[in-house]
Amino acid sequence: MTSNFSSTVAGLPRIGAKRELKFALEGYWNGSIEGRELAQTARQLVNTASDSLSGLDSVPFAGRSYYDAMLDTAAILGVLPERFDDIADHENDGLPLWIDRYFGAARGTETLPAQAMTKWFDTNYHYLVPELSADTRFVLDASALIEDLRCQQVRGVNARPVLVGPLTFLSLARTTDGSNPLDHLPALFEVYERLIKSFDTEWVQIDEPALVTDVAPEVLEQVRAGYTTLAKRDGVFVNTYFGSGDQALNTLAGIGLGAIGVDLVTHGVTELAAWKGEELLVAGIVDGRNIWRTDLCAALASLKRLAARGPIAVSTSCSLLHVPYTLEAENIEPEVRDWLAFGSEKITEVKLLADALAGNIDAAAFDAASAAIASRRTSPRTAPITQELPGRSRGSFDTRVTLQEKSLELPALPTTTIGSFPQTPSIRSARARLRKESITLEQYEEAMREEIDLVIAKQEELGLDVLVHGEPERNDMVQYFSELLDGFLSTANGWVQSYGSRCVRPPVLFGNVSRPAPMTVKWFQYAQSLTQKHVKGMLTGPVTILAWSFVRDDQPLATTADQVALALRDEINDLIEAGAKIIQVDEPAIRELLPLRDVDKPAYLQWSVDSFRLATAGAPDDVQIHTHMCYSEFNEVISSVIALDADVTTIEAARSDMQVLAALKSSGFELGVGPGVWDIHSPRVPSAQEVDGLLEAALQSVDPRQLWVNPDCGLKTRGWPEVEASLKVLVESAKQAREKIGATI
């Protein structure tokens, strides 16, 4: 019989407070460090993570993860993609034998494409999409995780292994033969029965965030049956997050599980009627996704009501993977700093609440939290704003097309890029020197102009039709704007993992948003002065700015989005006055904020479309508005993409084998569209045959008069040799396709 715990967190970040894993991975990939050093760095990081929870009585432990938990699970289950089977086992240097196949699946090789990558539920974290088929057979190998777990036990850590659950793993998988991944659910539960028995631990945590989504009743029956079998092992803890736990409790309560975890933040503390107190309720009352301080008094009151019904433990609403490590090194103005809690502060909040629930209240800490909550509520910087909004509509698309054809005079199948070009060491060095004040702002801006000179010249040499300035001045497509808008702040060390070795530093949107001055106009003007071709003005859209920031939670997202949209509308007007004929307003994140339950989706889609249109509707009809979208499974949102009313929509498509085309075709999409023909996330130059094939597939689904030719995403993370070689292939493919269709615009 297991003993209950009283305090924990749902999970921990893996990248390191100083991004140690990022730098070790990049060193291993470029050959500057050996595998043993990478393995040692990863071990040090998991030890440090476990030690950070020394005040809690149960520690989640996912082992040394080198890229992504879903990819870790695929490796444990023996279902890394078959195309990487010929990669030999790794030498015994502390890394798993399968690590080179694992990295091949994550990043691709010179000849093999990587697995698809998309967003983890409605977050800004990315996972690698498992590839299965009807013939998939699971071959269990948890030896690396078991070894890591034993190391923690030797260190005296009360660790519990954390696994991605069978339902979630299969719900997020894709098949290569059109079969249903969930057909494997009974077989996978049998594998998990063996897997959890292999752990010599009191508790085993199995994460099932898929249980907060819409799940078919017959699948829920299979899930209940599967977990009834797993519950024969003591100490099985099924954790859910990113939504209400009611469906999970309706499915799993009373079947003999040791614990069930629920998110009490995303939709608040719901009734949880199915919980009768038979199992430990792990109450996710501290927000694991956002960075606002917890109202400890309100949280304690909710916990006490639950504790009257049965045993509970205090936890975070989800893994702390999604928030920065600590406020400790941040130089943030005191008023706003008091409103915030990063990872280590949230761990402290969990401990404070657990102690208070046990009768040991830290009155000073609770008083400080209450004062911070009151300060935020009454600050003039967060006061509601009432204003009349301008219109959200432009002229008809037919009218706009006619005017834009005359204004732009582009060829059929026009070629362009998404916006950014390589952020070279010299660019990063100039930015770092500016931060350290070792160069002046004037010297920095001259270095950026020199980079724009290079980018424009190379694009003209390659023969691209519509150019970009390359965005050398932008550290990040959201952070750049947040640093120029009132109502935001930037952190110095607020890094979170986006995927693999890529980390981002989300800005904090803490108050009312406004634009004190133009943000991009001078860079556009300089770039346009260098060429006779059209240069796109480049902006990030309101939904993406919200999605990739930590956003205030004290007013509706729709209200905050409209504030950002109005600032962008002013910027668009200034770009047009400066001569811009094409303006791109990127919304790569528009799908990732889509609610997980169908009932909640219409309201989100309405306000997200409204905010984009509020930003862009001031543009004259002869100005072409572009937008760009990433990681987008378009079947669910295609009607909203149409409703955005952008003249051209470029879409990440190459990595998913042009799956977006079916949605475009079935919807009768009549606007301009550019499904990406080069997967920029894999470090390889696409072959002419590969790009030709993707472009041919696009032409079979899209009218040539609508079609643009472009990469999947921006080129910021790629190197110049790869970029030039790949764009050369892309431009040549477009030229040959033009000859075949014999069309001009």
Swiss-Prot record:
Top-level EC class as recorded in UniProt: transferase
Cofactors (names): Zn(2+)
Protein name: 5-methyltetrahydropteroyltriglutamate--homocysteine methyltransferase
Species: Corynebacterium glutamicum (strain ATCC 13032 / DSM 20300 / JCM 1318 / BCRC 11384 / CCUG 27702 / LMG 3730 / NBRC 12168 / NCIMB 10025 / NRRL B-2784 / 534)
Family annotation (InterPro entries): Cbl-indep_Met_Synth_N, Cobalamin-indep_Met_synthase, Met_Synth_C/arc, UROD/MetE-like_sf
Coiled coil regions, renumbered to chain: none
Pathway info: Amino-acid biosynthesis; L-methionine biosynthesis via de novo pathway; L-methionine from L-homocysteine (MetE route): step 1/1
Family: Belongs to the vitamin-B12 independent methionine synthase family.
